[in-house]
């Protein structure tokens, strides 16, 4: 078994004007257990960043902290700064629901509402008081086009979303998330329940989406990280070990631990 120096790290940083989101000294605790150990990380605007690492490394916990999804867990506590547009969104006075309009999330398994395809998109807007049908129609079409789903469902908008395939349901969930025009889209293993063809379609959708959004994705699939991301961060035991351009991580990692992990020789 290889012995690694876990105190040795290599973390990429960006000029401030390119940063869409950043964290400073973020820790996450579940009760007395420290799951995330003081992570400093910056995410470049309009790029795709992949978070990789073994199961239990903390990458999903860290991702969920970025728009305070960990708030839903009673024993979870998040400390440190999560900076979006110069504002620490981890402060207690922040309106979490408003913040999530700017930092949206797509979950591991597709979770469409048991409503029509159309109302999956419009539901949040209707609750916010949007009543003009033309406006709602435009939101639906724009969002579905951005999620590369419009051509497949435009004649079936009033059918149940539950009739869609798994890949289509996941792209509908993406359309629903981006319909409120977030700046940042968090994706927690969005392809884990999809077949290879649907996964490829999802990755193609991500490439298009990054023109308008900053995407941060957790994946266990090394090939997906290598194919679909601009930057990759390697997590281990709640810490960020190496963060660099994806090509560097997979072809010329600075640290032996990272190189061993992405090449399948870790341990």
From Swiss-Prot:
Positions of the ABC transporter domain: 21-262
Reaction(s) this enzyme catalyzes, per UniProt: phosphate(out) + ATP + H2O = ADP + 2 phosphate(in) + H(+)
Keywords, sorted A to Z: ATP-binding, Cell membrane, Membrane, Nucleotide-binding, Phosphate transport, Translocase, Transport
GO MF term list: ATP binding; ATP hydrolysis activity; ATPase-coupled phosphate ion transmembrane transporter activity
The name this protein goes by in its record: Phosphate import ATP-binding protein PstB 2
KW Cell membrane (keyword) present: yes
Coiled-coil region list: none
Chain's gene name: pstB2
Ribosomal protein listed as a keyword: no
SMART domains xref list: AAA (SM00382)
One of the GO biological process terms: phosphate ion transmembrane transport
Topology of the protein relative to the lipid bilayer: Peripheral membrane protein
Subcellular location: Cell membrane
Species in which this protein is naturally found: Streptococcus pneumoniae (strain ATCC BAA-255 / R6)
Enzyme class, broadest EC rank: translocase
């Amino acid at each position: 078994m290889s012995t690694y120096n876990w105190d040795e790290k290599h973390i990429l940083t960006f000029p401030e004007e390119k940063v869409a989101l950043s964290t400073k000294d973020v820790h996450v605790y579940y009760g007395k257990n420290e799951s995330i150990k003081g992570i400093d990380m910056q995410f470049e605007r309009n790029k795709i960043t992949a978070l990789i690492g073994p199961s239990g490394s903390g990458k999903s916990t860290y991702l969920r902290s970025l728009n305070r999804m960990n708030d839903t867990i009673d024993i979870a506590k998040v400390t440190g700064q999560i900076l979006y547009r110069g504002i620490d969104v981890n402060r207690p006075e922040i309106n979490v629901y408003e913040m999530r309009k700017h930092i949206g999330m797509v979950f591991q398994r597709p979770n469409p509402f048991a409503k029509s395809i159309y109302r999956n998109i419009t539901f949040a807007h209707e609750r916010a008081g949007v009543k003009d049908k033309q406006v709602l129609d435009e939101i639906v079409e724009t969002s579905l086009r951005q999620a590369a789903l419009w051509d497949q469902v435009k004649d079936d908008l009033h059918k149940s979303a539950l009739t869609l395939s798994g890949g289509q349901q996941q792209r509908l969930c993406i359309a629903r998330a981006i319909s409120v025009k977030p700046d940042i889209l968090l994706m927690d293993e969005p392809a884990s329940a999809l077949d290879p063809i649907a996964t490829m379609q999802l990755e193609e959708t991500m490439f298009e989406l990054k023109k308008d959004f900053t995407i941060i994705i957790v994946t266990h699939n090394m090939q997906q990280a290598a194919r679909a991301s601009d930057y990759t961060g390697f997590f281990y035991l709640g810490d960020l070990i190496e963060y660099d351009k994806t090509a560097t991580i997979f072809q010329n990692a600075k640290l032996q631990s990272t190189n061993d992990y992405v090449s399948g020789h870790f341990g």
